């Protein structure tokens, strides 16, 4: 199943961050984050949690950002 991360990408831009910034914050390479955002790899629960904290995404909204097809 392929997920659509356009809402997550928009949120990253809203915060004035780059994919490189987010990747550094969660401890992965920017290329790895790109793979995840393009559906070539999956996010771990820890990565999702860290991104939600960084971008102030409420737990009840996680599905809207990470599990939309």
Model-identified regions with their sequence ranges:
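A short, Lys/Arg-rich alpha-helix, primarily the initiator
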Residues: 1-17
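Residues within the helices of the helix-turn-helix
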Residues: 9, 20, 49
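The alpha-helix within a helix-turn-helix
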Residues: 12, 23, 52
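Residue-level signal for the short linker/turn that defines the boundary of a DNA-recognition helix
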Residues: 17, 43-46
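Short alpha-helical DNA-recognition segment
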Residues: 17-35
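DNA major-groove recognition helix of helix-turn-helix
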Residues: 37, 47, 66
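DNA major-groove recognition helix of helix-turn-helix/homeodomain DNA-binding modules
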Residues: 46-61
């Amino acid at each position: 199943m392929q997920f659509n991360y356009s809402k997550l990408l928009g949120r990253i831009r809203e915060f004035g961050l780059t994919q490189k910034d987010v990747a550094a914050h969660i401890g992965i390479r920017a290329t790895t984050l790109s793979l995840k955002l393009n559906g070539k790899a999956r996010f771990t629960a820890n990565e999702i949690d860290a991104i939600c904290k960084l971008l102030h995404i409420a737990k009840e909204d996680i599905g809207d950002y990470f599990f939309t097809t």
